[in-house]
Amino acid sequence: MQKKFVLAIGVAVALGACHSTSYHSDEAIVEVPFTEVHVTDHFWAPRIEVNRTVSIPSAFRQCEINGRFDNFALAGGLIKGEHKGDFPFDDTDPYKIIEGASYSLAVKYDPKLDAYLDSVITLIGAAQEPDGYLTTCVTNKCERLNRWWGSKRWEKLNSHELYNSGHLYEAAVAHYQATGKRSLLDIALKNADLVCKDFGPGEGQKHVPSGHPIIEMGLAKLYKVTDEQKYLDMAKYFVEETG
């Protein structure tokens, strides 16, 4: 019995020691930047390399085949034609792939991929309207998709306009952190400034939720790289407005 009692005390002391060094709720949680993470094992490293050499180029090729890039070129007045695709959120395909490609550049620099991203970002910049607005099906006035976006910008919650913006922001931050280039980041900030102007609790602003979560995360990331409080406030507004 005495041995059991001593053992119990020992376990209690050990647990107490563990508790004293555990995480405290008032401590900030800071993620490890992806630019500082490099996987070199024999399982994941080869797959990451396949992603760089096969998957990412294939994904961009699908954007070329399915008109994702053409929509940006059309919105920018670089080509003539009709808007392609069946959804208002097709713009996010290039954004998502740019984000992934940026992670890849941080792992292993690829000058060909870097230059390709520059060319895609040029198209995206051409499609952006002077005040920062960026959703190609709206700029291109694609009547086929009116059931999604209506007849003017910001008209319907299910338009995915803010969803598009959120993925743009995430791609822009990843590209900036991986390359140091501001080309896509400046496009994203111009769009975010428009969102901060048009949405919110103030008079004359749209008092609505985002319609589809992702812009909240994107705005928070913009805040982290710019230290501009308005982006974090905008993210908080959308979260609270959603309820």
Where are these regions (language model features)?
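Bimodal feature
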Residues: 1-2, 19-22
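Sec-dependent signal peptide recognition
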Residues: 2-8
